[in-house]
């Protein structure tokens, strides 16, 4: 039977946050940031395993209590210098541990997207389980885009029709994803880009604005509000 396996990338340093600890461990709504996505993914019955890819030198993970997820999580200290390297290393570690088959689905998620909801994950699974390629959560672009010159002057306004903002999870079969990442050009920033480079067209599944990536310190307040509101409702 084909399995669904989640893989959370958590090997980054979070340098843009200006913190002494990696961003994924930054306290958020009373828990480390990574906890919120981990809880959502572990709560999905169709997902058999949630793998967390940490940096080899990570010392923060063991400082926290993860017992509630025992039996469903797998830790790999094999993160690389880039997101693509971390995902590639995680997939190879899964294969070496005999936890995955070529046709199993892999859902790659960023630890810094704590606003991921059960509804979004279930929607992704429903819409992609029988897809030939796979796909990703994304939201149609709402903001007006300006292209600038080197002096910070507007060159033109870019049309936003058919433009989407990529989110995670991004879901592809194990064999395809590993092949795509191993052949990917330098500088790719997500898994879908690697698959696109093979000439394939991933499917866009509508996400929502709550599933944004926490990147800068000011993002933390918004993420905190979202998570606390969710806890109340």
Curated annotation (Swiss-Prot):
<keyword id="KW-0808">Transferase</keyword>
<comment type="similarity">
    <text>Belongs to the IspD/TarI cytidylyltransferase family. IspD subfamily.</text>
</comment>
<dbReference type="InterPro" id="IPR029044">
    <property type="entry name" value="Nucleotide-diphossugar_trans"/>
</dbReference>
<feature type="site" description="Transition state stabilizer">
    <location>
        <position position="16"/>
    </location>
</feature>
<dbReference type="InterPro" id="IPR001228">
    <property type="entry name" value="IspD"/>
</dbReference>
<keyword id="KW-0414">Isoprene biosynthesis</keyword>
<dbReference type="Pfam" id="PF01128">
    <property type="entry name" value="IspD"/>
</dbReference>
<dbReference type="InterPro" id="IPR034683">
    <property type="entry name" value="IspD/TarI"/>
</dbReference>
<keyword id="KW-0548">Nucleotidyltransferase</keyword>
<feature type="site" description="Positions MEP for the nucleophilic attack">
    <location>
        <position position="213"/>
    </location>
</feature>
<feature type="site" description="Positions MEP for the nucleophilic attack">
    <location>
        <position position="160"/>
    </location>
</feature>
<dbReference type="GO" id="GO:0019288">
    <property type="term" value="P:isopentenyl diphosphate biosynthetic process, methylerythritol 4-phosphate pathway"/>
</dbReference>
<dbReference type="GO" id="GO:0050518">
    <property type="term" value="F:2-C-methyl-D-erythritol 4-phosphate cytidylyltransferase activity"/>
</dbReference>
<comment type="pathway">
    <text>Isoprenoid biosynthesis; isopentenyl diphosphate biosynthesis via DXP pathway; isopentenyl diphosphate from 1-deoxy-D-xylulose 5-phosphate: step 2/6.</text>
</comment>
<dbReference type="InterPro" id="IPR018294">
    <property type="entry name" value="ISPD_synthase_CS"/>
</dbReference>
<protein>
    <recommendedName>
        <fullName>2-C-methyl-D-erythritol 4-phosphate cytidylyltransferase</fullName>
        <ecNumber>2.7.7.60</ecNumber>
    </recommendedName>
</protein>
<comment type="function">
    <text>Catalyzes the formation of 4-diphosphocytidyl-2-C-methyl-D-erythritol from CTP and 2-C-methyl-D-erythritol 4-phosphate (MEP).</text>
</comment>
<feature type="site" description="Transition state stabilizer">
    <location>
        <position position="23"/>
    </location>
</feature>
<dbReference type="InterPro" id="IPR050088">
    <property type="entry name" value="IspD/TarI_cytidylyltransf_bact"/>
</dbReference>
């Amino acid at each position: 039977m084909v399995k669904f396996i989640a893989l959370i990338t958590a090997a980054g340093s979070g340098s843009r946050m200006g913190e002494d600890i990696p961003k994924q461990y930054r306290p958020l709504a009373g828990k480390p940031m990574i906890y919120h996505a981990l809880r959502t993914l572990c709560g999905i019955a169709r997902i058999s395993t949630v793998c967390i890819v940490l940096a080899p030198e990570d010392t923060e993970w063991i400082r926290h209590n993860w017992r509630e997820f025992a039996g469903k999580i797998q830790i790999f200290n094999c993160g690389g210098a880039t997101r693509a390297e971390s995902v590639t290393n995680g997939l190879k570690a899964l294969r070496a541990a005999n936890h995955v088959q070529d046709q199993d689905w892999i859902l790659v998620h960023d630890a810094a997207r704590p606003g991921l909801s059960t509804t979004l994950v279930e929607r992704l699974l429903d819409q992609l389980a029988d897809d030939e390629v796979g796909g990703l959560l994304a939201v149609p672009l709402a903001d007006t885009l300006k292209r600038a010159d080197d002096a910070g002057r507007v060159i033109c306004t870019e049309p936003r029709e058919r433009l989407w903002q990529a989110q995670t999870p991004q879901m592809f079969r194990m064999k395809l994803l590993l092949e795509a990442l191993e052949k990917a050009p330098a500088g790719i920033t997500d898994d879908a880009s690697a698959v696109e480079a093979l000439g394939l067209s991933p499917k866009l599944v509508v996400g929502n604005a709550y599933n944004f990536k926490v990147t800068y310190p000011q993002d933390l307040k918004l993420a905190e509000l979202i998570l606390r509101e969710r806890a109340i409702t």
